[in-house]
Amino acid sequence: MACKQICITLVAVCSILLVIVLVRTFTLVPRKDAVIACKTADSDFIKLTDQIVKRFQRALQIKTISFKRGDYNRDQLLLLSSHLEKSFPLVHSSPLVKLDIIANYSRLYTITGSNTSLTPYLLTAHLDVVPAIPEEWEFPPFEAQIKDEYIYARGAIDFKQGIMGILEALEYLLSKGFKPNRPFYIAFGHDEEVTGVDGARVVGQELKARGLKKLEFLLDEGLAVLNGFIPGIQKPVALIGIGEKGFLTLKLHVKGEAGHSSMPLKETAIGILAKAVVKIEDNPLPSMLGYGPEKEMLEHLAHEMPLAARIIMSNLWLFGPLVSWVFSQKPPTNAIIRTVTSVTMFNGGVKTNVLPSDATAYINHRIHPAQSIQEIIDYDRAIINDDRVKLSVEDSMVAASGSPSGENDFGYQIISNSIRQIWTNATTAPALLFGNTDTRHYSMITKNIYRFCPTVMFLGDEKRFHGINERISKKNLEQAINFYYHIITNADENSLTNIHQHSDEL
């Protein structure tokens, strides 16, 4: 009798679980507002012209390189500023637009809106780029040459397309007599690639000093429109970053005894440190799946996946351990679910026949938003479990927690809708950005921070980011300009129900 009762109970439990799984699988579909697609035949479509391309090429040819904190090419930053002012005369002469130069090189535009009761928003980009080694490129990285409809140059992706896209859109709108209802800001920092402490940080302080207490949302660079990156999904996936990983660089140091290699000690400084490094690499931090933006991303994308994957991704509460194991097998997906660890430097010894007196290694962690810097330090210390290995913090930054991405969150939905107006077959989803941006310098005036680049990427293109042969297609440049046009016009409304229609008068 007891056995029968147990069987009945098990069947009942399994039946309930099955019902819950199926209900979530077929009802967990994210909001998708109806939007009017942006078409080249529309009267307000911004067509790419030779003049637009030349302006973009010239911006790319200016070597606004940042090398390290405080070390950036000041003359080139001034040259780029001059180029922007010559290229966009309406932006720089309109009574609706006020430009302030911040910290000598960063640019803050204030655009007046007629309805001061509407909360302003902020569009950001950065003027600087990372260095490039010309010998490794197919084309010189600062000539902006065109081949097969692609423009090759450092900054084509990161992030002069943002600067030029925003200003091209605003120049076009002003030429059509656009008078915004909602006030907004545009900010271009000059040292984002070296943490933004001289540029965006000062811009953020300036906005706060003006008494700005709140932004409706902030849009900066970030994730992109991805093709073929997510197995099982055929259509493009546009990921909107709602959070950023933090980072922690730890120095591991061992002090040993010097001596001659003919009379070796039982353990040398290098040997002790090597064992510590092996322990770190052999013991990855635990999966944080379900505690950060990755959960929202997978649930948003589940409805685009084949049925089996859809069932699993819609029910992470049940299948989370399985997904964590699968994701742990490959570096790109492993980085989504946990704090990752990289041993980046190892130094020890001065001569082949001399025992090293000390050894040093550097560990870089990219921290999941669900964990703190101190947690990671404590974890490493416990795993190493050797008092001879001294840990010290070289640099760190806390992770940025997730911004709201619900059905009624204005900023997220404006960005999502604008994306789908340009890339009509794309699906959008919130996600976690692995790198860091200038957005942290504005976190005191808004929590609605989003990170998205209007860049189309195919498998392999991710290596061009900060890498060799960075490029953007002319078609993608046109899409980027029209994306920012839609951001400005859509955000000008006072609610999500009033998305800009192409027939609307500006």
Model segments located where?
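N-terminal Sec-pathway targeting helices
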Residues: M1-C14
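An extended, acidic, His-containing surface patch that forms the Zn2+-binding/catalytic region
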Residues: C7, K47, K98-I102, T116, ...
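Acidic/His- and Gly-rich active-site-bordering loop/insert found
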Residues: V11-R154, S175-R182, I363
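Short, solvent-exposed loop/turn segments at the edges of secondary structure
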Residues: N104, F139, N181, K214, ...
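Acidic/histidine-rich catalytic neighborhood of metal-dependent amide-processing enzymes
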Residues: Y150-I151, I157-L239
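A short core secondary-structure module
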Residues: R201-Q205, E257, S262-P286
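Flexible glycine/proline-rich, aromatic-decorated loop/lid segments
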Residues: G222-L223, Q234-T249, F452-E462, H466
